[in-house]
């Protein structure tokens, strides 16, 4: 298993080459799916809650574009991919379709992405600021369904410890 977790590989050509090598070696690539140019400065999920709070949003598309790109690279190279901490209904649908096509892909979700929504950030507490961000109830329900139907293969904590001072910072300044 090869990964650069925490930082999705932004360059499609570099990722293509990585998948080609992984295919030759019989190694699975694990990908944190985030198009960083779409998430720069984002604090929480882009939706009605972030609009109401006046905070910069993180679009679902930032995850879904990279999931789509990597599925197509798997199709091209014959490599296998594991998608880390899926959080959107769209991503679950993409992985479900890839599996139906017989592609060698797996995925995981976190406990918080199957149980918590972006509405918790109305408290302005940085305790709920995670990467990828908490999403809508519709996304939570889609991730749960993906777990039930086998689209999502595992639950993983994606534990990223922070000192308490960083979680006590204002939401827009916390990591």
Enumerate the language-model features and the residues they cover:
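Short intrinsically disordered, low-complexity coil segments enriched in acidic
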Residues: 1-6, 173-175
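Histidine/acidic residue-rich metal-binding segments in metalloenzymes
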Residues: 3-155
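Short acidic-hydrophobic catalytic motif
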Residues: 158
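Conserved nucleotide- and phosphate/pyrophosphate-binding catalytic cores
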Residues: 164-175
């Amino acid at each position: 298993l090869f990964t650069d977790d925490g930082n999705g590989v932004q360059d499609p050509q570099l990722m293509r080459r990585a998948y080609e090598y992984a295919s030759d070696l019989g190694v699975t690539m694990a990908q944190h799916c985030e198009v960083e140019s779409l998430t720069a400065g984002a604090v929480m999920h882009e939706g009605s809650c972030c609009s109401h709070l006046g905070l910069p949003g993180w679009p679902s598309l930032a995850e879904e574009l990279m999931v789509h790109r990597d599925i197509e690279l798997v199709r091209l190279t014959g490599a296998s991919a594991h998608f880390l901490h899926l959080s959107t209904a769209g991503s679950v649908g993409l992985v479900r379709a890839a599996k139906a096509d017989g592609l060698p892909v797996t995925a995981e979700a976190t406990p918080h992405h199957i149980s918590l929504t972006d509405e918790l950030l109305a408290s302005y507490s940085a305790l709920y600021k995670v990467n990828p961000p908490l999403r809508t109830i519709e996304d939570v329900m889609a991730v749960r369904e993906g777990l039930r139907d086998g689209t999502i293969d595992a639950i993983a904590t994606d534990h990223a410890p922070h000192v308490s001072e960083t979680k006590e910072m204002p939401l827009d300044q916390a990591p």
